[in-house]
């Protein structure tokens, strides 16, 4: 059997195991998936093997089928509205498990990959054992947690004993990662109000209040305001929060914009003794090209560039950075990717 066919057969098997009416459920999903309806999402009625029926969003059904596709076992309980996701750990012989409300899968579609990677949901928190570092704990599951802790996309920087300015700190995942790797202090900058509040909770859950300093703001080359807009927590990781007035129009939800100079002065960051991390969906162009005098003060940089989204060239950034840094792309390509730079 071709390897590319096997995952889809698992998804069909999963539908048969989860639902008594698996055939019409799959038909409804297929019609939606291939755009054969004008409805962008919608719901489907599923009938569980333990009795009862429940309506779930098609986006939730997609996550359930994906779970089976990647090798998890999913069991749906129509009575409680919960799903049990189970994955056998072939290394340790243990089971990774998550028992979660079905509606939570709609906003946390990274859940199947998390369970497969070793995360466990105890009904309240997501936890994962990190070799040599203990257990990390988070309120919700998002894709960036897997990128940071499972893929270790930020492993290239040497943070032990250093100050780290973490721009685009989201819910604290990267800040907590840096703290566990021995950072002396992490200044975690996040403009989205709900993501920022969740970051505060996650910092407390991991007992890192003495290491991580949260800042509810965005980074820019000039002080002022940036526009948040009507963006969810999950969507903010793929949204460029532009300075207010950028592109015209009013903005109902704003957050303060801070500069590197302000952060350096306020927190006593010493030149040559700090790391700058940026994952701010485009602000790297503004900061590197328009505030380079402060960028060059950092010992190492690691940032995700978004050249395609910003309709700019990666070469613009590298031409400026190559004045003082040795830079290399550690993942991605010309359109989007992660750049690591060390000061000469």
List PLM regions with ranges.
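Phosphate/nucleotide-binding beta-alpha loop and adjacent structural elements of enzyme active sites
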Residues: 1-344
């Amino acid at each position: 059997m071709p390897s590319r066919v096997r995952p889809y057969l698992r998804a069909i098997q999963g539908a048969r195991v989860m639902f008594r009416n698996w055939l019409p459920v799959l038909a409804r999903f297929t019609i939606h998936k291939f755009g054969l309806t004008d409805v962008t999402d919608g719901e489907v009625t599923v009938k569980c093997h333990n009795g009862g029926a429940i309506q779930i969003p098609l986006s939730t059904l997609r996550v359930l089928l994906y779970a089976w596709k990647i090798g998890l076992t999913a069991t749906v309980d129509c009575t409680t509205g919960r799903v049990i996701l189970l994955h056998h750990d072939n290394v340790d012989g243990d089971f990774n498990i998550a028992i979660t409300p079905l509606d939570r899968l709609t906003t946390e579609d990274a859940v199947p990959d998390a369970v497969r990677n070793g995360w466990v949901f105890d009904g309240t928190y997501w936890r994962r054992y990190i070799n040599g570092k203990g257990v990390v704990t988070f309120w919700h599951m998002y894709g960036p947690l897997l990128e940071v802790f499972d893929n270790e996309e930020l492993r290239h920087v040497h943070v032990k004993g250093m100050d780290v300015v973490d721009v685009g700190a989201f819910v604290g995942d990267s800040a907590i990662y840096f703290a566990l790797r021995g950072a002396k202090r992490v200044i975690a900058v996040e403009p989205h109000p709900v993501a920022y509040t969740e970051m505060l909770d996650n910092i407390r859950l991991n007992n890192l209040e003495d290491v991580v300093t949260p800042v509810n703001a965005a980074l820019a080359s000039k002080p002022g305001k940036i526009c948040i807009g009507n963006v969810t927590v999950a969507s903010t990781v793929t949204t460029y929060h532009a300075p207010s007035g950028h592109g015209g129009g009013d903005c109902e939800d704003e957050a303060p914009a801070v500069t590197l100079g302000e952060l350096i002065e306020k927190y006593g960051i010493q030149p040559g003794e700090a790391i700058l991390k940026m994952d701010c969906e485009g602000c790297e162009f503004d900061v590197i090209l328009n505030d380079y005098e402060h960028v060059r003060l950092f010992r190492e940089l690691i940032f995700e560039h978004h050249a395609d989204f910003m309709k700019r060239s990666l070469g613009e950034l590298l031409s400026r950075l190559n004045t003082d840094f040795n830079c290399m792309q550690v993942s991605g390509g010309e359109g989007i990717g992660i750049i690591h730079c060390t000061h000469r």
